[in-house]
């Protein structure tokens, strides 16, 4: 046997028990690309196998224990190196000793709490992953496998429309209305704009969907605004009494649910920004926050009962009967 057991090393592979049947979804990585990951919901069990393959047959691998962890953590990019863990579960797979041959270890994390949605933003990343580690004297051997978590909501009981009047005194007076204040990610924003007074020459009007990511607290707060969509309402001059309909489909845009004060580290909010431009290129705008949520087609046949029970309800809504949840819905 070589000194300190350096002559032997190993490869680790993590395989989920339901890897062949579990759904995969695309998720943005830190470099802006997209990869596919296994999808989980709050309350679902995470189980599988850790395969340890010795690279050099006939040589033993000394170790100080083998373990697997399930971790949920938040990383703020301006504070790299400090990972804020909000879920940390550990299973010991083997006590300190030696491995004389390749070996497979089973693991199971039962009904795991996954309170937040996976998110990769401009200044923050929230991720869930499994990490298997062979502890050694000087250099541990480890392998990570990321998963994606999505949070589900039922229909909010209170979902009032948005009605506002905006304008410039004696020049412009507009009344606009959106049919709801809370929309699921594949919803349609329906509304109208009514011109009560028009004494300036408007040449263009649009609605923008603005995503605002806020990270940090106190003096160290960072805001990142990103225009997700631009929807042209009109190109030309409106007249008094004119009413313009709005119909904006959200399904074609890449958005997440609204995330408020996640673990006291960050928020993601969405706004409808009504923009008017006059012939002198002056811009007038009015912003209104909306809430986005992931529609819980809560009981699809492919979804486990435990995930159904754990599916998150929209905050502030009252629990609905289980029978109501059991209706299959299509996006």
Swiss-Prot record:
A UniProt-annotated Pfam family: Vps26
Family: Belongs to the VPS26 family.
Protein's job: Acts as a component of the retromer cargo-selective complex (CSC). The CSC is believed to be the core functional component of retromer or respective retromer complex variants acting to prevent missorting of selected transmembrane cargo proteins into the lysosomal degradation pathway. Retromer mediates retrograde transport of cargo proteins from endosomes to the trans-Golgi network (TGN).
Organism: Danio rerio
One annotated Gene Ontology cellular component of this protein: retromer complex
Name recorded for this polypeptide: Vacuolar protein sorting-associated protein 26B
Subcellular location(s) per record: Cytoplasm; Membrane; Endosome
Signal peptide (residue range): none
InterPro entries for this protein: Arrestin-like_C (IPR014752), Vps26-related (IPR028934)
Quaternary structure annotation from Swiss-Prot or TrEMBL: Component of the heterotrimeric retromer cargo-selective complex (CSC) which is believed to associate with variable sorting nexins to form functionally distinct retromer complex variants.
Transmembrane segments: none
Main location: cytoplasm
Keyword Cytoplasm in annotation: yes
Gene Ontology biological process: intracellular protein transport; retrograde transport, endosome to Golgi
Residue segments, region Disordered: 310-331
Membrane disposition: Peripheral membrane protein
Keywords, comma-separated and alphabetical: Cytoplasm, Endosome, Membrane, Protein transport, Transport
């Amino acid at each position: 046997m070589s000194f300190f057991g350096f002559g032997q090393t190993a490869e680790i592979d993590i395989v989920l028990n339901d890897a062949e049947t579990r759904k995969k979804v695309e998720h943005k990585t830190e470099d802006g690309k997209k990869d596919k990951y296994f999808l989980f919901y709050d309350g679902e069990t995470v189980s599988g196998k850790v395969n340890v393959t010795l690279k050099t047959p006939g040589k033993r691998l000394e170790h100080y224990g083998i373990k697997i962890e399930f971790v949920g953590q938040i990383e703020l990019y301006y504070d790299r190196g400090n990972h804020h863990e909000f879920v940390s579960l550990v299973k010991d797979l083997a006590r300190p000793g030696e491995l004389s041959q390749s070996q497979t270890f089973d693991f199971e994390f039962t009904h795991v709490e996954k309170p937040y949605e996976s998110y990769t933003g401009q200044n923050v990343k929230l991720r869930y992953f499994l990490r298997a580690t062979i502890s050694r004297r000087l250099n541990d051997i480890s392998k990570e496998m990321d998963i994606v978590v999505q949070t589900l909501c039922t229909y909010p009981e209170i979902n009032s429309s948005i009605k506002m009047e905006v304008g410039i005194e004696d020049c412009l007076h507009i009344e606009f209305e959106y049919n709801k204040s809370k929309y699921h990610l594949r919803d349609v924003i329906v509304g109208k704009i009514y011109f009560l007074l028009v004494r300036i020459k408007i040449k263009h009007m649009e609605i923008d969907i603005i995503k605002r990511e806020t990270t940090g607290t106190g003096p160290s707060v960072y805001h990142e605004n990103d225009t997700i969509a631009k929807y042209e309402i009109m190109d030309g001059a409106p007249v008094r009494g004119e009413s313009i309909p709005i119909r904006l489909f959200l399904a074609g845009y890449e958005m997440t649910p609204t995330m408020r004060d996640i673990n006291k580290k960050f928020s993601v909010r969405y706004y409808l920004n009504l923009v008017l431009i006059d012939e002198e290129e002056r811009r007038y705008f009015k912003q209104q926050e909306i809430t986005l949520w992931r529609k819980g087609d809560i009981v699809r046949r492919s979804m486990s009962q435990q995930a159904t029970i754990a599916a998150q309800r929209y905050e502030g809504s009252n629990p609905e009967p289980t029978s109501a949840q059991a209706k299959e819905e299509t996006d």
